[in-house]
């Protein structure tokens, strides 16, 4: 885990990277959807790799036809998610992630879509919003964990964060 965020619990994040999995969770109405909607609002700035946007666009077109991208774009605008273009530093972080956490190299088994999010989180030194068992097996800080969310056995947030309220 990133030493800047290790074991740090906060009420709000200065910034975070968003993987495709929380957005898919929200649109599919999974049990984790409410937790992700709530948590995304607790970050001052949200970022997404252009590669992740392409991945989501393919998913949305496949599930909802070409009109699906309009729903996706509206969601990104509503949550003010900034799209970051791919650059050489991200490629280098992605290569590192693939060699150390990619399919066939580590139980994390990051796929290409995961690696776009991994690379951006590494480049920006920010935690990552994600769902699933892949990213917890990497050196990326978990944004949901930082916000004190609990998880089920598949690393889906399922309990509202602990609060003093």
Language-model segments: which ranges?
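A generic structural signal for short hydrophobic patches within well-formed alpha-helices
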Residues: 23-24, 53, 135-136
